[in-house]
Design a protein with these regions (language model features):
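Long, contiguous binding/interaction regions
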Residues: 1-46, 52-107
Length: 107
């Protein structure tokens, strides 16, 4: 779950294919002080990646992610930075978290 400290903004990029999403996520995390929340396979290969942090960091991260995808010759379907998101958005973004996406192992 997102910490209240980092809930100042959300940054999202949606593109086609896991390779491009990984490149975007890597560029986003390297470009700014953001927390990678997770990803979601939206439909038919379109995948969104989500970060959170302060507004400036999310803008920098999204710009870097979009550039990284474009530099690989792919297209970004959509991107957005949501400043001061309403706390109820966590009901949606909660599904992006890695603990919801990855299988758990029992000891």
């Amino acid at each position: 779950m997102m910490s209240k400290k980092n809930y100042e903004a959300l940054g999202l990029i949606e593109t086609f294919g896991i390779v491009f999403v990984l490149e975007a996520a890597d560029a986003m995390c390297k470009a700014a002080d953001v927390e990678l929340i997770g990803f979601e396979n939206v439909a038919s290969g379109y995948i969104s990646v989500l970060v959170t942090g302060d507004v400036g960091a999310c803008r920098t991260a999204v710009d870097a992610g979009v550039k990284a995808v474009n530099d690989m010759g792919a297209e970004v379907y959509s991107s957005v930075v949501i400043a001061r998101p309403h706390e109820d958005l966590e009901k949606i973004t909660r599904r992006y978290t890695f603990d919801k996406l990855l299988p758990t192992t029992e000891d």
